[in-house]
């Protein structure tokens, strides 16, 4: 029992000592915390005082620094504005306006196009001295330039003149047929052909032994030419591309006239011989050669210039000479033209009917038929058969306001019928008419 008490007492003593030790440690920790809190508060006070001092210093020095910044900003603004104005003046003077001393007025023409038109053929440049010293080199150069231009066109259009298949031109036949049909309709409705031919025959200067010529029959046909077998070839004679087209027309184009042969010997109107002629073209076929040219590129010799001038003198008497002279001037100026001709192996068939006499009449005299047919063939050969050709100047293709049209819908109206060659026709206005939109 005594040992248990001793152990209990010892244990109690240890517990008490441990509690006291814990209280001491707790107290020491509290004291340390208080000391640390006081140190932190002191540091905060010091920092607060330092911040206040800095703010006071900044408030004292701020007016002086603001004055310096304001002055430097004003200087920069003024200098910047002046520099911008100076740059604008320099740009306007040297880049917008041209130098008046370097501007030399020149005549408008080909020289004005130098430096404006883009020239892509850079390999074909030659000095003026080379062209002036050697004329043959100039011809060779122009020939080479033309050949290279043709080669470039064929290359860029993927056309081989030697192996390319011929074309049918069906679409072109439709367009030509529409045009001819429109011309025939206008001729039937307005009698354009009759009045034109009648005025020509009336105003023509005839020999004394021929009386006035009267029209008896006009037939403008009802069929259309057929163009086919179109192929592009290189013309060796004129050094240009040509379109060769086969043309075939099977139709009846008739012109009938009536006149009188006068016998004025030994006295005027001693005898009168009535003559009636009817000439019909029933068949034409041949190879048409078409090409676009510049009238200044080649030497186009006018085959019948003298006779044309004589013909124009008659027109001058009627008041049309001004237009003819203007046409001559236009031809001298050059420009784009359509050149066409027919091959010598063409086929042209006629039917000539003649009736001579008043009571005892001679019908279809072979000599007269042969004479008229030969004259017509000669007239055609001298104008359209190779090596001669026709040149038709083309109008300008640039869009112009005066050529602008727009469709206008109109009511269908009819006018009193007209009679042409025994056939009555009425004028019909269709809704598809066009008017000038610039009116």
UniProtKB/Swiss-Prot annotation:
> What's the name of the protein?
Maintenance of mitochondrial morphology protein 1
Classify the main location: endoplasmic reticulum
Matches recorded under Pfam families: MMM1
Q: Which stretch is the leader sequence?
A: none
Q: Which region ranges are annotated with the description Disordered?
A: 125-145, 309-336, 405-425
Q: Which residues cross the membrane?
A: 77-97
Q: Which family does it belong to?
A: Belongs to the MMM1 family.
Q: Which residues form the SMP-LTD domain?
A: 165-395
Q: From the Swiss-Prot or TrEMBL record, what is one GO molecular function term? A: lipid binding
Summary of the function given for this chain in its UniProt record: Component of the ERMES/MDM complex, which serves as a molecular tether to connect the endoplasmic reticulum (ER) and mitochondria. Components of this complex are involved in the control of mitochondrial shape and protein biogenesis, and function in nonvesicular lipid trafficking between the ER and mitochondria. The MDM12-MMM1 subcomplex functions in the major beta-barrel assembly pathway that is responsible for biogenesis of all outer membrane beta-barrel proteins, and acts in a late step after the SAM complex.
Q: Which organism is it from?
A: Candida albicans (strain WO-1)
Q: Which residues lie on this side of the membrane: Cytoplasmic?
A: 98-439
* Residues in compartment: Lumenal: 1-76
Compartments, as annotated in UniProt: Endoplasmic reticulum membrane
Q: Which UniProt keywords apply?
A: Endoplasmic reticulum, Lipid transport, Lipid-binding, Membrane, Transmembrane, Transmembrane helix, Transport
One GO CC annotation: ERMES complex
Q: How does it sit in the membrane?
A: Single-pass type I membrane protein
Tell me a GO biological process for this protein: mitochondrial genome maintenance
Q: Which domain of life is it from?
A: Eukaryota
């Amino acid at each position: 029992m005594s040992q248990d008490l001793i152990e209990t007492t010892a244990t109690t003593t240890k517990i008490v000592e441990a509690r006291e030790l814990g209280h001491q440690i707790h107290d020491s920790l509290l004291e340390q915390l208080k000391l640390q809190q006081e140190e932190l508060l002191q540091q905060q006070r010091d920092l607060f005082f330092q911040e206040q001092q800095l703010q006071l210093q900044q408030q004292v020095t701020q007016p002086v620094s603001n004055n310096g910044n304001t002055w430097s900003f004003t200087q920069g603004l003024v200098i910047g504005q002046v520099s911008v104005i100076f740059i604008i003046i320099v740009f306007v003077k040297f880049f917008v306006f041209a130098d008046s001393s370097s501007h030399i007025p020149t005549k408008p023409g080909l020289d004005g196009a130098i430096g404006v038109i883009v020239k892509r053929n850079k390999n074909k440049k030659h000095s003026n001295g080379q062209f002036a010293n050697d004329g043959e080199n100039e011809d060779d150069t122009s020939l080479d330039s033309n050949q290279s231009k043709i080669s470039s066109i064929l290359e860029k259009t993927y056309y081989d003149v030697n192996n390319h298949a011929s074309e049918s031109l069906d679409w072109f036949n439709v367009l030509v047929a529409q045009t001819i049909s429109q011309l025939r309709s206008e001729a039937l409705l307005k009698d354009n052909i009759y009045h034109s031919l009648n005025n020509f025959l009336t105003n023509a200067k005839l020999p004394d032994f021929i009386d006035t010529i009267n029209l008896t029959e006009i037939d403008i046909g009802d069929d259309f030419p057929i163009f086919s077998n179109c192929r592009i070839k290189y013309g060796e004679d004129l050094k240009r591309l040509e379109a060769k087209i086969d043309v075939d027309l099977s139709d009846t184009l008739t012109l009938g006239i009536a006149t009188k042969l006068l016998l004025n010997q030994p006295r005027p109107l001693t005898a009168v011989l009535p003559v009636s002629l009817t000439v019909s073209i029933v068949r034409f076929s041949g190879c048409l050669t078409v090409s676009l040219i510049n009238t200044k590129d080649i030497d186009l010799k006018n085959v019948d210039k003298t006779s044309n001038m004589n013909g124009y003198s008659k027109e001058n008497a009627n008041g049309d000479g001004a237009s003819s002279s203007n046409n001559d001037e236009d031809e001298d100026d050059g420009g784009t033209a359509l050149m066409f001709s027919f091959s010598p192996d063409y086929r042209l068939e006629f039917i000539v009917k003649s009736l001579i006499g008043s009571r005892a009449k001679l019908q279809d005299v072979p000599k007269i038929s042969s004479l008229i047919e030969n004259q017509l063939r000669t007239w055609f050969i001298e104008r359209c058969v190779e090596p001669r050709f026709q040149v038709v100047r083309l109008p300008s293709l640039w869009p112009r306001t005066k050529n602008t049209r727009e469709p206008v819908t109109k009511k269908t109206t009819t006018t009193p019928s007209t009679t042409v060659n025994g056939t009555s026709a009425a004028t019909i206005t269709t809704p598809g008419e066009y008017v000038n939109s610039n009116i």
